Design a protein with these regions (language model features):
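Bacterial N-terminal signal peptides that target proteins for export
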Residues: 2-9
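Interaction-mediating elements
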Residues: 23-367, 481
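Gram-negative/organellar outer-membrane beta-barrel architecture
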Residues: 334-335, 354-633, 638, 735-736, ...
Length: 867
């Protein structure tokens, strides 16, 4: 422990020396100051200042122009240090060099600039290190008083928008001429706010006036007595525009002049008479303004060009098919039935224009896998909107090649090449057949395999999925399912086989899925979800899981010491069965030996789960609510996903009706029903995953997650299948632990190099992350994770969830991470996790601060955010 403390102190000391030895003012010119901070000071004598700050509710640093340079992980000015590593004499040369286009930056350009700046002795040198420091570092931010004055005016505009018309912002500076650093201080006096005395509406169009005075239309956010707030005026404007654009007023306020507010301040600038105006001015030939009613539009013709090449001047040359009032046009014999296109359309000929329906139509089109949207044109003709939509079909066949790689505690290295072949439009309605073939070659850790060859394991997997862009149901649901929902169905089959991976599984699967989704909601149902898993090498269990083998051998030694005349059993299973049946031996164990026997029973439970052959036939329903997909994405979006799975009930009914073959009775005399010699699983499983993100400012956010899951076997099953059980630890879990090594509950710790796999029937997990931009596409994060797994089997009381104690059994981990954004959608993640609170220790020793070692984090790699 002393060594760990010394190591941590050494690391912290080195960081401290680095901090003080790398001056951030090294390149600050004489008479200038390094700008280090903006400070905002409100009037302390104002008795209502707390309330006023709450009303403003803004990060003031977003409204000032000059900001201090960023700091690595929020603490270290790393990029300023890197910039200063480049000698100052090269600054002017490098500034001119990087001002040029990248295509002309070469040694010739660099040499000419060095000569120009009297640095001829460096001609011919690439200066790559110095250029790297200069280009990747960050130049010092110098105090700019003009920018500070501009920022003060910007702050005043903010306060004015919040109703403080008499606000005053005074700028001063705290300059340290010795350190060459300065702070800008903004002294803020808000004064008294202004209020809306009266609120009135003047609307020139009678139809719009009647609508805005209806129960829906008059739900205004502006009221007499409210404090003036410009944000509320914008909210009210957007509300009215949204209402009218969804009542046929296609081009309402597109000019920005149809709706406006006026505030009368003649009586007092503290009590305002506010009026909202809606009117449409046009100019006649004499350029005289006159008011005219707004046009309410309906859809006319909707022309769907199935191939963008079909847009020709002479439409008589096209094959035209009318389907449900839509015109579908082709250049040749149709490959797709008209319904494939029209299913996406929420807008219909003759309907009143509604902006939401236009947006939903485009979203539905973008979900179509076989076509690209080439154009969406709306043409006004009096009060009619004619629509032309152009599509480009994708290729009939598409081959996608991919390669994946990974490493784990079990597998030193694995590479997985694969390919997916897509055959589009099999039956003319947009049906696709996807076939994926994937192979894996890997090197199993020597602790888990007797085969010492480098590539000593493989897996081959194939999956076929037939996808339908509609619901496969006995009845037609077109008139029941709203158009804002898109529907899909899929029939899937898969098979895989392993060699020298675990117990060498062979897996077969089949399922029928239906998916109904809108912008925020998704309902997914899996019927006849069937999985068959066969472990071909069950006898290798103790070779693979060496910790369990050690436990078995220790109990074996105790058993033969207790009963020297016991027979020598041929198999390990015969031995463990005999030990389980010997109550006299069990009652003879005390102290550490009794604890060892509990570990032995847990090992047998684990072995039964992992090595069992499994047949699952289940029904699954999953509900997802995701505000990040809404029409107007929220700044603090929610994500909620709930899932329930019911397995074995159909087979149980058939078993009772027809009488399946039965397994040998267990110790309680129960006999499981068999199909092809395998007990079918019967259980109910429920999960809920709740997440929320909070945007703090343009560069940082906080994200949190709560996850709960439970599985309860019953009927034909005593234990839950391993593939449906819960584990804790890993890159998306409690990151201070490796996968499957945390828990269950407060199970005593063992040698981490010999850790058994841990899984159970119940899970609780909490995660929190503070995410912030470092520079460019690189993001940093601090995280805190807490969670564990527990059992629900009363025959194993040491693993049970206990309401009065569960919070003491949370594993708590923390750490920092880096995320690099590749393009728009992909993120490469690297996390360093540390154990903070370890429930495997005795109660008084669970906090791990004394054992904390900065040099030994748990390292995790991942793709995209963990939640």
């Amino acid at each position: 422990m002393q060594k760990k403390i010394t190591t941590n102190i050494t690391i912290i000391s080195c960081l401290g020396l680095l901090f003080y030895s790398c001056s951030t003012t090294k390149k600050v010119p004489e008479g200038e100051y390094l700008f280090v901070k903006n400070k905002f000071i409100y009037d302390k004598e104002d008795p209502d200042i707390k309330k006023k700050k709450t009303i403003i509710n803004k990060d003031l640093s977003d409204y000032v122009k000059q900001k201090p340079a960023g700091k690595f992980l929020g603490f270290f000015p790393l990029w300023q240090w890197v910039y200063n590593w480049s000698p100052a004499k090269f600054d002017e040369t490098f500034q001119e060099y990087y001002r040029q286009d990248a295509s002309v930056r070469n040694q010739k350009l660099l040499d000419s600039l060095l000569t120009k700046n009297n640095l001829s002795e460096y001609v011919g040198h690439s200066l790559w290190k110095e250029r790297l420091y200069y280009s990747q570092g960050e130049a010092p931010v110098l105090l700019d008083e003009q920018q500070s004055e501009f920022s003060a005016k910007n702050l005043n505009r903010l306060f004015h928008d919040k109703g403080y018309f008499d606000s005053k912002v005074a700028v001063s500076y705290d300059k340290d001429s010795v350190a060459k650093k300065a702070e800008t201080i903004y002294d803020i006096k808000l004064g008294e706010p202004s209020y809306i005395e009266t609120y009135d509406q003047k609307i020139s169009d009678q139809k719009i006036e009647e609508y805005l005075n209806s129960p829906i239309g008059k739900q205004t956010v502006l009221h007499a007595g409210d404090q003036y707030n410009f944000d509320k005026f914008e909210e009210e404007r957007d509300r009215i525009i949204d209402l009218l654009k969804n009542r046929g007023y296609y081009d309402f306020n597109d000019s920005g002049e149809d709706l406006y507010f006026e505030a009368d301040t003649l009586k007092s600038n503290k009590r305002l008479d506010v009026t909202m105006f809606i009117d449409k001015y046009i100019q006649d030939s004499l350029k005289t303004d006159s008011i005219t009613p707004f046009t309410q539009y309906r859809f006319g013709k909707i022309n769907i060009y199935a191939d963008s090449r079909s847009f020709v001047d002479d439409e008589s040359k096209l094959i035209k098919e009318e389907y449900k009032d839509y015109n579908v046009l082709y250049t040749k014999e149709p490959e797709y039935r008209p319904r494939y296109f029209t299913d996406a359309f929420v807008i219909r000929p003759g309907q009143l224009y509604r902006q939401r329906q236009e947006i939903q139509t485009k979203r539905n089109i973008f979900k179509k896998e076989n076509i690209n949207l080439h154009g969406f044109r709306i043409n006004k003709q009096d009060s009619i909107l004619n629509v032309d939509v152009f599509f480009t079909p994708k290729k009939k066949y598409d081959l996608n090649l991919f390669v994946e790689s990974y490493a784990s505690r079990y597998m030193n290295f694995a590479i997985s090449p694969g390919m997916t072949l897509t055959s589009r439009n099999l039956f003319g309605g947009g049906e696709n057949l996807e076939t994926t073939l994937k192979g894996t070659l890997g090197s199993v850790n020597k602790d888990f395999s007797m085969n010492k060859a480098f590539l000593n394991a493989y897996e081959i997997a194939i999956e076929t999925k037939l996808k339908f862009p509609y619901l496969l149901t006995p009845i037609n649901l077109d008139n029941i399912l709203p158009k804002r929902f898109t529907a899909e169905s899929a029939i899937r089959m898969n098979a895989s086989t392993q060699k020298n991976v675990g117990l060498d599984k062979t897996t077969y699967g089949f399922g029928f899925d239906m998916d109904i989704s809108s912008s925020e909601f998704q309902h997914k149902v899996s019927l006849f979800n069937t999985e068959f898993i066969s472990n071909r090498k069950k006898d290798r269990y103790y070779e693979v899981f060496t910790k369990d083998n050690n436990t078995k051998n220790e109990i074996k030694d105790l058993y033969y010491a207790y009963n020297p005349n016991a027979p020598i059993y041929v198999t390990d299973d015969e031995l463990t069965d005999a030990i389980e049946a010997d109550k006299g031996f069990q009652s003879s164990l005390t102290g550490e030996d009794a604890k060892l026997y509990v570990d032995f029973e847990n090992m047998l439970y684990r072995k039964a789960n992992i090595s069992q052959n499994v047949l699952i036939n289940s029904f699954i329903y999953q509900f997802t609510f995701n505000q990040e997909n809404s029409f107007r994405p929220k700044s603090n979006p929610w994500f909620i996903q709930a899932r329930i799975e019911l397995a074995g009930n159909v087979l149980r009914g058939l078993d009772k009706a027809f009488g399946f073959n039965k397994a040998e009775p267990d110790r309680e005399g129960n006999q499981a029903g068999l199909i092809f010699g395998i007990p079918y699983s019967q259980f109910v499983k429920f999960d809920v995953d709740v997440r929320r993100k909070f945007k703090l400012n343009s560069n940082s956010s906080v994200a949190g997650r709560f996850l709960f899951g439970i599985i309860q076997p019953y009927g034909n099953s005593d234990v839950a299948p391993f593939v449906r059980s819960y584990s804790a630890g890993g890159a998306n879990d409690v990151r201070g632990w490796a996968p499957l090594t945390l828990g269950p509950g407060s199970k005593p710790r063992i040698d981490s190099k010999n850790q058994s796999l841990e899984f159970e029937s119940m899970k609780l997990l909490f995660n929190a992350e503070y995410r912030f931009n470092l520079f460019g596409s690189l993001e940093g994060a601090y995280f805190l994770d807490a969670g564990n797994i527990w059992g629900v089997n009363k025959n194993r009381p040491e693993t049970l969830f206990k309401f009065k104690d569960f919070y003491r059994e949370f594993g708590i981990g923390s750490g920092l991470g880096f995320r690099y954004h590749i393009g728009t959608f992909a993120i490469v993640r690297f996390d360093l996790g540390y154990k903070i609170y370890d429930p495997s220790y005795e109660l008084g020793d669970r906090w791990q601060f004394d054992n904390f070692n900065l040099l030994k984090p748990r390292i995790h790699f991942g793709i995209n955010y963990p939640f």
